């Protein structure tokens, strides 16, 4: 259920409780607030030096494009290393390929604007792999090449105001999930409607996911990522409507229908909320909502790590980011799994109640949350605890909440009554207002 009648998109949330402030400060020490953007020239130099690096995990070297449709969002026979990594360790490679393509070419916003958003997030974190792919995507159209030239040439002020605002929005939301102020948001709203704002936000969230996936797995940059790219317009996703407004497609109607059906058939280990408010917001862009949901379900189904461990990871990430909405959801999920309330009480303060395996997972997750990268030693320790497949799943769960924290608290989505009730049953009457100033 919605709490209140109006959902205000993307306003700053101020965390008033001292416990959360200290927890978040410790978890995110050394983060990138205020750091200069990495230049595109430096990222390209870094990327060329990463062609022959050793990844943290095995890649499906023999995988062909025929086995994973649209492995390359631009089409053709290329299979990126992020698809090879997922194919080796999960069954979710086809769904992720579809997600990438849908984020870039689905919805109503310009693909080039969304590609530039991915590039900007790569600049924030210094992700050479992500930047190489984002620039390749931009080179696949005339307008993309023009946008890329402006960014490389330091002529960002020459961009249309809507594009400049989108890039600023991406940077603010990437640096801090509460980084978009009311005034920042009102400037965005002057150029974009609610559905477009949701699409912008999902693109920023996806880029934060994508950077962490690529960096956690230490993926080598493919040599072909630097090759000239022919003009590309993938068929089947974006066809210019003759009407003055875009018509909802059969696929988008199916996405909405599928979400309604799923709410009536609760998933094992789910939260029991029906359609959560996060889903209600995402369904303003049904194609992206469906692609994200299908990918998430494909990762979760048949996972090697337990559902409880997944929730411990997402709790740690959400607490580190100061995300009210997602923290309440993780408490609800852990409570529904039967986790001892005493453990939940302790987890709000420190890690003393965690098992050795849980501590290994959440420690890794916090590092990946903070800087969007980890060391070889960090990943080796994770593999020693969970094996290679389990380590990949820990990374994917962390990435998922880099996405969800920014989407939910970034858009200031209201917590559902059921989530509030569960939280306050553990932490006391008025705990949501006390802990989250909400």
Summary of predicted features, one role per range:
Residues 1-11:
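Bacterial N-terminal signal peptides that target proteins for export
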Residues 2, 27-113, 139, 222-309, ...:
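Secretory/endomembrane lumenal or extracellular ectodomains immediately following the signal peptide
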Residues 10-22:
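Bacterial N-terminal signal peptides
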Residues 86, 96, 100, 116-122, ...:
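Short alpha-helical scaffolding segments that buttress acidic/His motifs in well-ordered protein cores
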Residues 114-148, 317-342:
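Conserved alpha-helical segments that form or flank metal/cofactor-binding pockets of metalloenzymes
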Residues 158-202, 349, 357-396:
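Acidic/histidine-rich alpha-helical segments that form the ligand environment
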Residues 184-187, 194-234, 388-435:
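Preference for long, well-ordered alpha-helical segments
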């Amino acid at each position: 259920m919605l709490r209140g009648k109006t959902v205000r998109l993307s306003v700053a949330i101020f965390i008033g409780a001292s416990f959360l402030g200290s927890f978040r400060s410790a978890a995110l020490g050394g983060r990138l607030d205020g750091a200069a953007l990495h230049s595109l020239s430096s990222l390209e130099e870094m990327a060329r030096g990463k062609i022959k690096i050793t990844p943290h995990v095995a890649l499906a070297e023999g995988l062909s494009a025929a086995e994973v449709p649209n492995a390359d969002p631009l089409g053709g026979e290329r299979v990126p290393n992020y698809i090879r990594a997922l194919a080796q360790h999960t069954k979710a490679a086809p769904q992720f390929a579809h997600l990438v393509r849908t984020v870039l070419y689905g919805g109503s916003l310009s693909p080039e604007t969304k590609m530039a958003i991915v590039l900007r997030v790569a600049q924030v974190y210094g992700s050479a792999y992500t930047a190489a792919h984002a620039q390749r995507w931009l080179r696949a159209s005339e307008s993309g090449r023009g946008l890329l030239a402006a960014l490389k040439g330091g002529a960002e002020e020459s961009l249309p105001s809507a594009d400049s605002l989108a890039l600023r929005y991406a940077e603010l939301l990437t640096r801090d999930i509460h980084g978009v102020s009311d005034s920042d948001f009102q400037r965005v709203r002057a150029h974009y409607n609610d559905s477009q704002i949701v699409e912008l936000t999902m693109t920023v969230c996806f880029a934060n996911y994508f950077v962490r996936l690529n960096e956690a797995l230490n993926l080598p940059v493919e040599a072909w990522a630097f090759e000239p790219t022919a003009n590309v317009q993938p068929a089947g996703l974006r066809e210019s409507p003759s009407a003055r407004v875009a018509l909802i497609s059969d696929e988008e109607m199916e996405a909405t229908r599928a979400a309604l059906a799923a709410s009536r058939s609760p998933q094992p280990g789910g939260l029991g909320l029906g359609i959560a408010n996060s889903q209600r917001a995402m369904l303003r862009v049904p194609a992206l909502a469906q692609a994200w949901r299908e990918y998430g379900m494909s990762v979760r189904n048949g996972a090697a790590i337990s559902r409880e461990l997944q929730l411990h990871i997402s709790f740690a990430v959400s607490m580190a980011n100061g995300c009210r909405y997602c923290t309440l959801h993780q408490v609800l999920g852990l409570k529904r799994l039967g986790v001892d309330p005493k453990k939940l009480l302790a987890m709000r303060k420190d890690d003393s109640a965690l098992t050795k395996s849980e501590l290994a997972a959440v420690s890794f997750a916090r590092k990946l949350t903070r800087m969007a990268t980890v060391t070889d030693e960090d990943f080796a320790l994770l593999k020693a605890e969970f094996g290679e497949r389990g380590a990949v799943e820990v990374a994917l769960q962390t990435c998922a909440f880099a996405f969800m924290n920014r989407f939910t608290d970034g858009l200031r989505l209201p917590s559902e009554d059921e989530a509030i009730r569960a939280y306050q049953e553990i932490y006391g009457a008025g705990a949501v207002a006390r802990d989250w100033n909400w």
